[in-house]
């Protein structure tokens, strides 16, 4: 996706939502399956346009601690400096455009490489 985010989105952060029990159930199953099969799992939260509210950050923290555990690294990029808040890198508050995705992919690759280096 190319282009910039429409100004209709730039003044309305998304409200914090409760954790969806069905999604949490399947996340738990995914984590259990990966552990059982010896698959190394990393959780990634990609950038959003808006800086998340305290309530939104707490929702991610609770989801992570309740359903994932401390043995799974969490790469939290939701409020990534240089990307979040830059309307030229998003098509809407939740989706980066091609350039935003390119920049984020580079940062994510670096973070993953540092996790998996011996």
List PLM regions with ranges.
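C-terminal regions of proteins
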Residues: 54, 59-118
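Active-site segments of SGNH/GDSL-like serine hydrolases
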Residues: 28-56
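Acidic-and-aromatic substrate-binding clefts and catalytic sites of carbohydrate-active enzymes
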Residues: 18-23, 49-59
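A short, structure-level motif marking secondary-structure boundaries and short turns
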Residues: 14-16, 48-49, 93
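Secreted/periplasmic serine-hydrolase-like ester/acetyl group-modifying domain
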Residues: 1-37
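Non-transmembrane, interaction-prone segments in cytosolic or luminal domains
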Residues: 19-20, 38, 49, 108, ...
């Amino acid at each position: 996706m190319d282009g910039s985010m429409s100004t209709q989105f730039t003044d309305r952060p998304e409200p914090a939502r409760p954790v969806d029990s069905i999604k949490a159930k399947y996340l738990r199953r995914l984590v259990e399956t990966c552990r059982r099969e010896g698959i190394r799992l990393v959780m990634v939260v990609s950038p959003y346009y808006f800086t998340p509210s305290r309530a939104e950050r707490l929702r991610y923290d609770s989801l992570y601690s309740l359903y994932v555990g401390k043995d799974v690294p969490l790469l939290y990029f939701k409020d990534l400096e240089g990307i979040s808040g830059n309307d030229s890198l998003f098509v809407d508050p939740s989706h980066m455009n091609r350039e935003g995705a390119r920049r984020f992919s580079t940062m994510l690759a670096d973070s993953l490489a540092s996790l998996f280096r011996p």
